[in-house]
A protein has these predicted regions:
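Aromatic-rich carbohydrate-binding modules that target alpha-glucans
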Residues: 1-25, 34-56, 108-156, 165-188, ...
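A short, polar/charged loop/turn motif at coil->beta-strand junctions and beta-hairpin connectors
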Residues: 10, 98, 113, 131, ...
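Residue-level signal for pocket-adjacent positions within structured domains
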Residues: 27, 47, 106, 132, ...
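Extracellular interaction modules
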Residues: 56-63, 68-69, 185-193
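Intrinsically disordered, low-complexity polar regions and short flexible loop motifs
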Residues: 63-81
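Catalytic cores of glycan-processing enzymes that make or break glycosidic bonds
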Residues: 77-96, 103, 150, 184-645
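A short, amphipathic beta-strand motif
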Residues: 100-108
């Protein structure tokens, strides 16, 4: 990479001259502002500028560039608009800078497919402000539009504006708002021998922002005659067709990542993925793979599909198991052809960083009958070399997992291309957390606080708060490699989606974090937050914090009946020890909500046991302060403590 230092011309303009070889090709470049004192840098927004070599015989090219700040309407530069809603299917020829010409380039992503951008100004070469004679621009570099104007037809300063026209009728769709632009180039004898490029402009849209309708739906809710009892990726094509007929521009999906943990209906929750990269095998259209050579076995699966499709509700377990059985048989029949293909090998190599660990995870999960990797013996802690060796030693099973992901990827990419061709954008969903028994937690545990849980504080709809069970993000650790995990995740999602819904976006900045041994959300604290030091409470609020009294469950004999009713005496004798002065402490086996729920999970479900369990959970919530999990000896007030005892 070459770095050039620029020199100031005045308060607003900087310049640099550079000699380039005659055979130089197209390349990208950026501008950087660097603080000479501390080295801090400010970078431009968006994609790099592009240098397009001028036509042969051009000795000098002068670039009048602009620093690229985040533009007004920057979402319009996303693929949802540039590759879908406003995509240009048939492009004009490229405009090449040439001597004796001024090339003007402007970014305008929101010009509709049936429109064209034009330039109009106060000179005859620009149509003299008459839209009928405005000079149409090329969309070859869309969302950048460009036009060449003969320098001999220009006088400086020239005034001009950009406008959008209907392609066929020439009717004006919109003038850009604001004052006229000014084009000023110092005219000299050599001007006709050089190429001049004015770049970095942005169409000033103004007016009402773009509005569009869309629909949100889980993939599993889509149904068609070609299903196998549950919606799949190929059903999305029908959804896109419906969106087109109803004038909608977005189809939003729930998360589509693999959630297989137990091979039961408990895996149906789409926000508890075992991988943030792998797609869900449930959404594979198995008929797209082909048919089994054995007509009896193929008939068996055809009948199963008919039976499952006739059900009023999805039979999650049978549909998932049926697809798994079919793909196993089909892989045994034709898998080798796919595995040996160049396209398959390229897919595996391109995705190896997440795909190999995911495949090993799936095989180990099934062999150990649990996704809890702490139960996997020598594989409980992820080791790259061990995982690689395991993949090599179990190539058949690993390749089967690759095979499924390969076809899921092909089908989802096909659907996205289909949607783009129809002008419909696909919108994905980014869950707030990851599963603590996922490939991500196994492969990169340092990126997560696995000893905590994400949730939400109490409100009028959930007085005990919410506990989602996901580990929270270790942002400090993630920052060490420039958030590589997040970048890889977004890159993968961008292969299938044009926009994202971010689940619980506030939690990415400040999360409600709950201890792992808690069940209710009441015992959580915000992270990050500033906890109190005991001396701060004494000096500023005259409050003497006693951790044993204020940060431990406060249990007094006289209010046990409020928690346990007629079972108060039994609760005292079974679960508590006296601590003096009418105070009680919970026994070791019942001093956390996790221990209590695990104990009663093995007891009979009776109203008495429900009351005992609920009472114990409430007593454990009965604290005034919670110790900070990272700064021991510092404390947070328990939320809604005013309602406690």
């Amino acid at each position: 990479n070459l770095e050039l230092t620029m020199s100031p011309l005045d308060n607003d303009n900087w310049s640099v001259s550079v000699e380039l070889p005659d055979d130089i090709g197209e390349f990208g470049y950026r501008y950087i502002v660097r603080d000479c004192d501390n080295g801090n840098e400010r970078h431009e927004w968006g994609a790099p500028h592009r240098f397009i070599p001028p036509a042969k015989g051009t000795g000098t090219i002068t670039l009048y560039d602009h620093w690229n700040d985040r533009p007004e309407g920057n979402p319009y530069y996303s693929s949802a608009f540039t590759e879908c809603i406003c995509a240009r299917r048939h492009r004009d020829g490229k405009t090449i800078p040439a001597k004796g010409h001024v090339t003007i380039r402007v970014s305008a992503p929101m010009v509709k497919p049936d429109e064209v951008l034009a330039i109009s100004g106060n000179l005859p070469a620009m149509g003299q402000w008459d839209p009928r004679h405005a000079v149409r621009m090329s969309d070859a570099g869309y969302p950048v539009w460009e036009v060449n104007i003969d320098v001999t037809s220009l006088t400086f300063p020239a005034e001009y504006k950009f406008l959008s026209l209907k392609k066929d009728s020439g009717e004006v769709s919109a003038w850009e708002y604001g004052r006229n632009r000014t084009l000023y180039i110092h005219k000299s004898d050599s001007l006709q021998q050089e190429a001049v490029v004015v770049d970095g402009l942005h169409f000033r849209t103004g007016g009402t922002p773009w509005r569009g309708a869309g629909v949100a739906i889980p993939v599993f809710s889509l149904r068609s005659e070609d299903d196998f009892g549950v919606g799949d990726f190929m059903d999305l094509k029908l959804m896109v067709d419906w969106a087109v007929r109803t004038g909608q521009k977005f189809v939003q999906l729930l998360p589509i990542n693999d959630t297989t943990m137990t091979h039961t209906w408990r895996d149906s929750y789409p926000y508890n993925a075992n991988s943030t990269f792998a797609l869900h095998p449930l959404y594979l259209r198995i008929s797209e793979l082909g048919r089994l050579d054995d007509p009896v076995r193929q008939k068996y699966y055809d009948n199963m599909a008919t039976e499952l499709n006739a059900l009023k509700e999805v039979d999650y377990e049978r549909a998932a198991q049926g697809k798994a059985e079919f793909t196993r048989e089909f892989f045994a029949q034709d898998g080798e052809l796919t595995v040996n293909s160049n396209d398959f090998k390229e897919f595996v190599e391109r995705n190896r960083k997440w795909l190999m660990p995911y495949a090993v995870f799936c095989v180990l999960r099934d062999r150990h009958n649990t996704s809890d990797f702490s139960c996997w013996g020598e594989f409980a802690v992820y080791d790259e070399r061990k995982a690689t060796r395991f993949a090599e030693d179990n190539a058949y099973d690993i390749n089967y997992v690759y095979f499924i992901q390969y076809h899921l990827d092909r089908q989802m990419r096909h659907v996205r291309s289909y949607a783009h061709a129809k002008g419909v954008a696909l919108k994905g969903d980014i869950p707030i957390g990851i599963s603590r028994t996922s490939v991500d937690a196994w492969q990169s545990p340092q990126l997560f606080y696995l000893d905590s849980q994400a949730g939400a504080p109490p409100d009028d709809f959930s007085v005990l708060g919410q506990n989602w069970g996901f580990p929270t993000y270790n942002w400090e650790e993630m920052s060490r490699d420039g958030f590589a995990w997040w970048k890889a995740r977004f890159r993968k999602m961008s292969e299938y989606f044009d926009a994202y819904r971010i689940d619980h976006i506030l939690g990415f900045f400040r999360i409600w974090q709950i201890p792992l041994d808690a069940v209710h959300g009441l015992l959580g604290v915000f992270h990050p937050a500033l906890p109190f030091q005991p001396e701060e409470l004494r000096e500023r609020y005259s409050f003497w914090l006693d951790p044993d009294l204020h940060a431990s469950p406060y249990i007094m004999d006289h209010f046990l009946a409020d928690f346990f009713g007629e079972y108060a005496e039994e609760a005292r004798s079974r679960f508590m020890n006296p601590a003096g002065y009418g105070r009680l402490k919970l026994k070791e086996g019942f001093n956390s909500q996790r221990k209590v729920t695990e104990y009663f999970a093995h007891e009979m479900k009776t109203s008495k046991n429900e009351r005992l369990c609920s009472g114990l959970m409430g007593l454990i919530d009965n604290v005034l302060f919670i110790e900070d999990p990272y700064e021991k000896g510092k404390y947070h007030p328990r939320i809604t403590a005013q309602y406690s005892y």
